[in-house]
């Protein structure tokens, strides 16, 4: 985007693909380095630690995380291209097996084969080509911290806060003006912590609000309307941007009414690096 703004390039095709489901899993078969000493061999272990810390600090109920999983599956069930289209009830979520306690199976994202691509261009170029469906980028932020989860000063405050602050400042809008959020949902706890890091609720209150007021298109915060990583596809990143663009064009399978601004999050590691994107309505 900066290269386009600087006039260095006119267009950029951004692509991603992965075979996480059918490809080699050799890198996950045994722990390495310091993680091996502690018997910690998966990304999920880091998130389980964060999930446990969240429950302990805020006395969070299992139903709070279930509200995230149920909303994602409800949206995925209405998406004909979603990998996981079976609806999930809160009772079924609570009855699900633990994989890495306190995380249950439905707290964890899918493993998927897939790919995605977006075309990035300048406003002038889009106008010259007569593209009235182009979705404008209003704000972008990025921040990161220690890769090692145990070295962070606070497990429940990620660099999502700094990333969002930059993006909202660039966009020049308030948090309550957001029409929907496409949040990186590798695990349900990630969604609750991102909501709080973004300043959409006070600390420790995202789960209760999600349970009471909903994350569907008619709820408090329409969330991951394609099903996200929990239901549509575990192929991370670009699909959330694509769904945000569809929403802002009025082309989504589960459509928010008259959206003006869309919020997208992305991250890597165990909440190690974070990016925030704010998009505006097409046209």
Regions found by a protein language model. Give the residues of each.
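Conserved catalytic cysteine-centered active-site region
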Residues: 1-47, 84-110, 140-145, 158-159, ...
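Condensing-enzyme catalytic core mediating Claisen C-C bond formation in acyl metabolism
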Residues: 66-67, 98-162, 166, 212-226, ...
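Active-site-proximal alpha-helical scaffold in enzymes
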Residues: 1-18, 44-78, 118-124, 232-252
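Phosphate/pyrophosphate-binding loops at sites that engage ATP/ADP/AMP, CoA/4′-phosphopantetheine
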Residues: 54-59, 127, 163-177, 252
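Extended C-terminal subregions enriched in glycine
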Residues: 157, 161, 165-188, 197, ...
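Conserved beta-ketoacyl condensing-enzyme motif
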Residues: 1-27, 175-197, 263
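Acidic, glycine-rich active-site loops and adjacent beta-strand->loop/helix elements
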Residues: 16-21, 71-72, 141-144, 184-188, ...
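Short glycine/threonine-rich loop-to-helix capping motif typified by GTGT followed
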Residues: 147-153, 185-208, 219, 270-278
